[in-house]
Amino acid sequence: GYAPPYIANFERDPAVPTSNQDVELIMNITDYDGTVDSVAIAWSADDTVSILNMPIYTLPLSPGTTDEYEYEIPAQTDGQTVRYYIYAADNDGNESWWPVKPTAQTTPNVEFYTVRDNGMMVYDIQYTLNPNGSSPLAGQEVTVKGVVTSSTKIGDLGYLYIQDESGSEWSGIWCVGIGLNTYYR
């Protein structure tokens, strides 16, 4: 058939691991007009390794399921960024990637996370390797600490901004939501 394997319900747990936590990846992969022939993950904690040269590991079907695949990335050191992508092919040679790779693009896109022993930083929300500029934590509820640099109070900017104490690039964020008027700088 013409349809490639469909990768859905992707989960990474934990979203921001500590250096003593393995990271579990779980997803469902189905092929609606054939069978899933192979599933693999490429990952690296070495940012000098190009995406196309990352080691590749086969993902087995989870026992007792017909479409669930799992992989565990071993614990990494604090501050380490881990990049990865999932690849699936069906019996007709059709291919799929997670995250999605445009047809004309030769290099797969990657998901990534940074290991943090002292909790998430604003940098982890803002820094991205995604070509579309979206956060690696888009759609997830997160807790982050930061220094208030602007508040919603009268005489201030009227918006709540926080940043990491280090104040380097990617380290500031505009906060939206309920209860923001209780923060001061």
Regions found by a protein language model. Give the residues of each.
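Glycan-association/targeting regions that enable binding to alpha-glucans and other polysaccharides
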Residues: G1-G119, S135
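OB-fold nucleic-acid-binding modules
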Residues: G1-Q21, T106-R185
